[in-house]
């Protein structure tokens, strides 16, 4: 059974189960029984005794309605909340257990979010089916027992339905999702690039292709839907013919109105129960499939617990070798490097020389078991590599993705508490005050900022974090890339000033040539993976 389904079952409350059973018995057995009794009395002209079963019928329907309004729906919504948060917790724990470099890859994978959504809605749909349609199962059991006791001959006919129902449940939709996905991906590519085609006078051509793609999608969908409907209706027709044949036998053997009504209702119940099992099984299959996808995207990896160093004065790197898993490229230290608090260090090298990977190692993103090292922190050899300093560093990546549809105040503060003084200081040092002041920071939406302004807001967030966290190491990967030269120089000078005054070891790479000319304590050259 799926781990997520087991997780879901653990959230089932006793109250929901009890009310489902009571409601199922009332809806599926008592109410139909009362209805049949009233029908028999009407046929027999026994109007005198109609009041009692009729009052009981109304009472049962009242009980069923009250249960749904005040109990079942409440329990079900609570269960849905627990399931949704439980699935989120399950996936978050799997993500948290991964090494950070794998986490980065996983979180950039669109399939993760897609699989998670399918899992959530498949599970919720499965619970809806089992709770709201459970009365069909109770009815099926009750009516089967009645027929077994009162009409065992006709039950043999219903046995013929078993292979039909099993076949219906096991039936796999002939639609291949990859066909739909391929067509839809073609449409998305055309749609996302249509502006460039329009401004280069290819608008009619691209729109014709988009319309043609949609037409192909709809033709494929229509063909598959018709084929599936033919199958479903054929199964329903087979069930209907068998139940009607059974009714004919009932009329020939025992022409009794009550028996006839029960057999007639049982035919409908068989259809409903078959659809119940079919829908539940398919949702379960969807759940299993997407859990396999999740498990492939999020493998279970036991990460070792690395003891953290709270403070240090120096880091001596005697050996460092990191081999890329998918290429022959290798990062290797040429000669020992010694780093100290308050130092400002520039990594210099062309694109592709390994600067970002070296920063990933220093930031602890790449786990220590993936590279060879000999590192001393304050003359003490560490077995955890740079991961021992994870809690003492701030890392600003080059291609970090951000949610820009957020107010500047919330973007800058992040998970830190708000401080007006620190906010003012951060906006000033990041040169943001020409487009957002301290008074406007709560009402300025970042999505409306230009590319350069977004770059400065990101630097304001970094400065805010530095002041709040007071790290020992600051790692900056080309944070000046989106800035004009004069702004880049001014902002980096401010960052250097903060680092020197707070004894922060700053390791950075720069995009702007003027920034590279600033006063650095050490420049580490990097060339084709060779450090130093």
UniProtKB/Swiss-Prot annotation:
SUPFAM superfamilies the UniProt entry points to: P-loop containing nucleoside triphosphate hydrolases
UniProt membrane topology term: Multi-pass membrane protein
Highest taxon in the source lineage: Viruses
Keywords carried by this UniProt record: ATP-binding, Membrane, Nucleotide-binding, Transmembrane, Transmembrane helix, Transport
Residues annotated to bind ATP: 349-356
Localization terms from the record: Membrane
Organism: Acanthamoeba polyphaga mimivirus (APMV)
PANTHER family, A to Z: METAL TRANSPORT SYSTEM ATP-BINDING PROTEIN TM_0124-RELATED
Residues covered by the ABC transporter domain: 315-531
Name of protein: Uncharacterized ABC transporter ATP-binding protein/permease L733
Matches recorded under Gene3D superfamilies: P-loop containing nucleotide triphosphate hydrolases (3.40.50.300)
Record's keyword annotation contains Cell inner membrane: no
Gene Ontology molecular function: ATP binding; ATP hydrolysis activity
Residues passing through the membrane, by range: 11-31, 51-71, 126-146, 147-167, 231-253
Gene Ontology CC annotation, any one: membrane
InterPro entries associated with the record: AAA+_ATPase, ABC_transporter-like_ATP-bd, Metal_Ion_Import_ABC, P-loop_NTPase
Keyword field contains Cell cycle: no
């Amino acid at each position: 059974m799926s781990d997520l389904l087991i997780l879901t079952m653990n959230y089932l409350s006793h109250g929901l189960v009890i009310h489902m059973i009571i409601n199922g018995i009332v809806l599926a057995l008592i109410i139909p029984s009362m209805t049949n009794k009233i029908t028999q009395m009407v046929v027999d002209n026994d109007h005198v005794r109609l009041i009692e079963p009729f009052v009981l019928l109304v009472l049962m329907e009242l009980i069923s309605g009250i249960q749904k309004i005040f109990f079942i729906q409440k329990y079900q919504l609570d269960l849905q909340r627990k399931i949704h948060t439980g699935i989120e917790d399950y996936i978050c724990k799997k993500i948290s257990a991964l090494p950070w470099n794998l986490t980065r890859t996983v979180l950039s994978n669109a399939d993760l979010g897609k699989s998670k959504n399918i899992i959530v809605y498949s599970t919720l749909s499965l619970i809806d089916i089992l709770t709201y349609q459970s009365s069909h199962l109770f009815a099926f059991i009750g009516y089967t027992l009645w027929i077994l006791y009162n009409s065992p001959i006709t039950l043999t006919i219903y046995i013929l339905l078993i292979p039909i129902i099993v076949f219906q449940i096991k039936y796999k939709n002939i639609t291949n999702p990859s066909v739909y996905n391929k067509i839809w991906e073609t449409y998305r590519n055309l749609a996302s690039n249509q502006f460039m085609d329009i401004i280069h006078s290819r608008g009619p051509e691209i729109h014709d292709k988009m319309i043609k793609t949609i037409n192909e999608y709809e033709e494929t969908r229509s063909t598959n839907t018709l084929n599936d409907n033919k199958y479903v209706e054929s199964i329903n027709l087979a069930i209907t013919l068998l139940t009607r044949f059974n009714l004919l036998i009932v009329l020939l053997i025992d022409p009794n109105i009550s028996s006839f009504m029960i057999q007639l209702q049982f035919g409908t119940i068989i259809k409903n129960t078959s659809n119940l099992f079919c829908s539940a099984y398919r949702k379960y299959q969807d759940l299993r499939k997407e859990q396999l996808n999740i498990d492939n995207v999020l493998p279970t990896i036991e990460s070792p617990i690395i003891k953290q160093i709270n403070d240090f004065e120096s880091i001596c790197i005697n050996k460092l070798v990191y081999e890329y898993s998918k290429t022959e490229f290798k990062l290797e230290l040429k000669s020992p490097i010694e780093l100290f608090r308050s130092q400002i260090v520039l990594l210099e090298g062309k694109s592709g020389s390994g600067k970002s990977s070296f920063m990933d190692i220093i930031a602890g993103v790449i786990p220590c078991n993936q590279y060879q090292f000999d590192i001393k922190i304050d003359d003490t050899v560490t077995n955890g590599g740079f991961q021992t300093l994870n809690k003492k560093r701030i890392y600003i990546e080059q291609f970090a993705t951000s949610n820009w549809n957020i107010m500047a105040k919330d973007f800058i503060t992040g998970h830190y508490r708000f401080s007006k003084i620190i906010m003012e200081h951060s906006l000033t040092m990041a040169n943001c005050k020409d487009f957002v002041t301290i008074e406007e920071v709560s009402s300025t939406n970042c999505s409306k900022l230009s590319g350069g302004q977004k770059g400065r807001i990101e630097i304001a967030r970094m400065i805010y974090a530095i002041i709040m966290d007071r790290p020992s190491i600051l790692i900056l990967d080309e944070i000046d890339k989106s800035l004009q030269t004069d702004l880049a120089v001014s902002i980096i000078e401010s960052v250097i000033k903060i680092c020197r005054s707070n004894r922060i070891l700053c390791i950075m790479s720069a995009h702007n040539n003027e920034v590279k000319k600033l006063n650095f304590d050490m420049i580490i050259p990097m060339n084709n993976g060779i450090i130093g």
